[in-house]
Amino acid sequence: MGLSPRLPYLVVEGPIGAGKTTLARRLAADTGARLLLEKPEDNPFLPRFYRDPVGGALPAQLGFLLQRAGQVETFQQGDLFDRHWVADFLFDKDRLFAELTLSPADLALYDTLFQRLAWDVPAPDAVIYLTGPIETLLERIARRGRDYEASIDARYLEDLSARYARFFGRYQAAPVIEVDVSQVDLVAQPELYQELLLALARPRGYTRLRQAELL
């Protein structure tokens, strides 16, 4: 099943450990869409941030902002409406991390650059918002074993997840499909994955897809 012609640009989002990249890869492979991924390993300031959240926050955040802006430039090269795209990040969510980690002075500097870069970024046609309990996210982070994520704790994830929930609770730029990854296993239960594809064919407003609703 390919993506709907009405969805040339699909985004998978959610807090750290939710499974964004895994789902984005699968959707791209199964639908023939082109893939646009975050590359945290290419941000040279990220390990420093996890070691020193205060001193390393601004360089890491600006590194991600510029990286994402560079990736979005792909859309300005004429291919956005010629091909389907699946991305594992939403440009606008970059500010969630900035609000969480930056001092007021650094946030003001960040906002100046963010506004310059964000004004012509295209909105997605639909967003899959992955969410789940903090315990589930921490287990997934530990399982993938990235050294620079070893210091992520429950308090940080709770704050980040709350910011995601508020952000998507009022997000109106595109339809949002929320998937609770603790209730819906899109890998072990292929029938639920097919239901997600069907939901993408008729996206509308804000939809919550949980196991009881999908079966």
Segments predicted by a language model, with ranges:
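NTP-dependent small-molecule kinase module
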Residues: 142-151, 155-215
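A glycine- and Lys/Arg-enriched "phosphate-lid" helix/loop adjacent to the NTP-binding pocket
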Residues: 94-165
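Conserved lysine of the Walker
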Residues: 20
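Glycine-rich phosphate-binding loop used to anchor ATP phosphates in small-molecule kinases
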Residues: 56-122
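P-loop (Walker A) phosphate-binding loop of NTP-binding proteins
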Residues: 15
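Post-Walker A alpha-helix
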Residues: 23-24
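Conserved substrate/cofactor phosphate-moiety recognition/catalytic segment
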Residues: 29-67
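Hydrophobic anchor at the beta1->P-loop junction of P-loop NTPases
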Residues: 12
